[in-house]
UniProtKB/Swiss-Prot annotation:
Protein name per UniProt: D-alanine--D-alanine ligase
Species the sequence originates in: Fusobacterium nucleatum subsp. nucleatum (strain ATCC 25586 / DSM 15643 / BCRC 10681 / CIP 101130 / JCM 8532 / KCTC 2640 / LMG 13131 / VPI 4355)
One GO MF term attached to the UniProt entry: D-alanine-D-alanine ligase activity
UniProt keyword annotations, A-Z: ATP-binding, Cell shape, Cell wall biogenesis/degradation, Cytoplasm, Ligase, Magnesium, Manganese, Metal-binding, Nucleotide-binding, Peptidoglycan synthesis
Domain ATP-grasp: start-end pairs: 98-283
Domain of life where this protein originates: Bacteria
Binding positions for Mg(2+) 1 per the UniProt entry: D238, E250
Gene that this polypeptide is encoded by: ddl
Enzyme Commission number(s): 6.3.2.4
Amino acid sequence: MRIAVFMGGTSSEKEISLKSGEAVLESLQKQGYDAYGVILDERNQVSAFVDNDYDLAYLVLHGGNGENGKIQAVLDILGKKYTGSGVLASAITMDKDKTKQIAQSVGIKTPKSYRPVEEIERFPVIIKPVDEGSSKGLFLCNNKEEAEEAVKKLAKPIIEDYIIGEELTVGVLNGEALGVLKIIPQADVLYDYDSKYAKGGSVHEFPAKIENKSYKEAMKIAEKIHSEFGMKGISRSDFILSEGELYFLEVNSSPGMTKTSLIPDLATLKGYSFDDVVRITVETFLE
């Protein structure tokens, strides 16, 4: 059995994908799997899946075609087994606006959205790309002028109320919530790209020191999101806890697996090591 770890790609999250892919590949090889890495770029986004010999495609791709369902569609056409969510779940959850609409339709509370800028009822607001991850292109705007400038910088912006509260994230593995982690940024008000991936950018408190009721509710909602969207393998849902109310922000169908990523920390709450998560993922998608 051969496992090809696909990483890289052409999205703005390429560097994180490479780091995640290297960590996963190292774990697989350490555990005795016949695994090798394949780095994707603009020239081989389809051919790499056709030309390589593998029984399982371990996808460690963040953003762009690696997370929006397109590569999953290629693998479906080829009849290849691959890790993670399928075409539909990947495509929908990559679009933050559609994700919010569906979440709201099943009774999950989210921050209020505006479009266009003229509709904003109060400031500050958060403006972010509708289809980027890793908090890329995230703006905190305190007035209309700042909002208009932020919107100009983004191809497809989404505008939301900025809710002050505790930033939480919940990992789900094969439908079961791993636990709740609180993110405490050390430098910036926002949990942006640098806070996520720079050493010392943030502190991860796990399990999150919040009321038991909120902890259980976050776990329940994350599992519901995983199920409602038809997600498979690993997902990670982000929330803001403000005055006892949980607000769902977004769900990630292909969360980072670097040494500073959130899923490895969350996995320890269930007694899983990084290697355990990788092994469970392989076993799940080879069935």
